[in-house]
Amino acid sequence: MDKYGLIGYPLGHSFSKGYFNEKFENEGIDAQYINFEIPSIEDLTEILDSNPELKGLNVTIPYKEKVISYLDQVSPEANAIGAVNVVKVEHKGDETILKGYNSDVIGFTQSIEPFIESFHKKTLILGTGGASKAINYGLKSLGLETVFVSRYERPGTIQYDKITPEVIKEYNVIVNCTPVGMYPHVDECPPLPYEAMDTHTLLYDLIYNPDETLFMKKGKERGATVKNGLEMLLLQAFASWDFWQEEK
């Protein structure tokens, strides 16, 4: 039986495990998907050694960047992004070859593109973690300018207290890559001047639990178009499977 899995820490609820095991059952695929909750990326070697049937891994927080040093090959896109969330495991004789890809950028780009209008030129990306790198790459591929927003002063970022109503009017696409507002903290939202939002504003939240975050709700009240991260999650899962099944 082939094995696939997810590495990260902590894992808690995993969409991928439920999705793939249901897929395997429904499609008669002799495989299982396992959560590998590892406190250190160094534990990856042990997982590979003790699971010779392993064909592929998804990678989540906090290892999307750290996993790269363990890989034999990285796709040009994942290399440019600087983050990997899909690993293909190939066995050639006694040798194990690890290939890294990024399906986050595929899922995000495909899911936001239908909502981009001609008046959407500039984007605020909330957060600076591994997911935000893929989001930045995807937005630029769609022709949008991007600026990162952080709680801390970092090169190439602006802080939340610098986001005025004027900034919101200019940067009218806002993508939340932070966990702020995720269940169970549903009464929290990024500190933004929501009153400046209008029908030209597009809010995209990578969070999918709850279905509508407070970030989305407050924007919607001002006429903004809003979207959560569930479709991105599904599309990146489709892309993960495609990467694992490639014959190359």
How would you label these PLM feature ranges?
Residues 8, 102-105, 112, 116, ...:
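Glycine-rich adenosine-cofactor-binding loop
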Residues 34, 124, 147:
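Conserved beta-strand positions in the Rossmann-like core of class I SAM-dependent methyltransferases
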Residues 141-159:
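NAD(P)-binding Rossmann-fold cofactor-contacting core
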Residues 156-227, 231:
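Rossmann-like adenosine-cofactor binding region
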Residues 87, 91-95, 144, 198-201, ...:
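A short helix->loop->beta-strand "cap" motif at the edges of active sites that frequently abuts
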Residues 110-111, 225-248:
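Active-site capping/gating segments
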Residues 2-115:
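Phosphate/diphosphate ligand-binding glycine-rich loop within oxidoreductases
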